[in-house]
Amino acid sequence: MSHELLRETPSQTAGPYVHIGLALAAAGNPTRDLEIWNRMAREDAPGQHILLLGHVYDGNGHLVRDSFLEFWQADSEGRYQERYDPEQPFNSFGRTATTFDAGEWTLHTVKPGVVRNAQGVPMAPHINMALFARGINIHLHTRLYFDDEAEANAACPVLNLIEQAPRRDTLVARRCEVNGQLAYRFDIRIQGDNETVFFDF
């Protein structure tokens, strides 16, 4: 039996409509009953609760105020949830968008535990990210690591695929405090000086 090979559908930039479909509150629309948004961990979720925040910059150093981000991470024990369930205290998947005024994104979660790669080698605690924004035809994949995990970062097999140390640093979020809460700042630079490392997954 022969199979017909179909051509890949061309990708398109996210454009101005991504918020209407996926970031309803940001677009000024009523939210759905089951909304996947920027609170991945409820207060009763085990682990160290953290706030992530940052900006997205284009190649000219200007804020990208209409970008959309998705996150996929392990829980505090290094386990991924296989399905989204609003009744459980933690979900591995979350979304957020930069605000139209300040251009800042935020995410409430717990610090992820250590996950092992396919060869069984432990990877440093990290959060997988996908960025959608105007002018980007195919969303960009990157990772967020933590600056207070220096020993784990130095041994991480994925982070060490990046040969130049300054390039590795573009994936490291900086510990800070926001209104008394432990937080990490992670700014994404799509192009230009200190461009964030993106992965071809």
Q: What spans do the regions from the language model cover?
A:
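Beta-strand-dominated extracellular/periplasmic modules and repeats
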Residues: 1-201
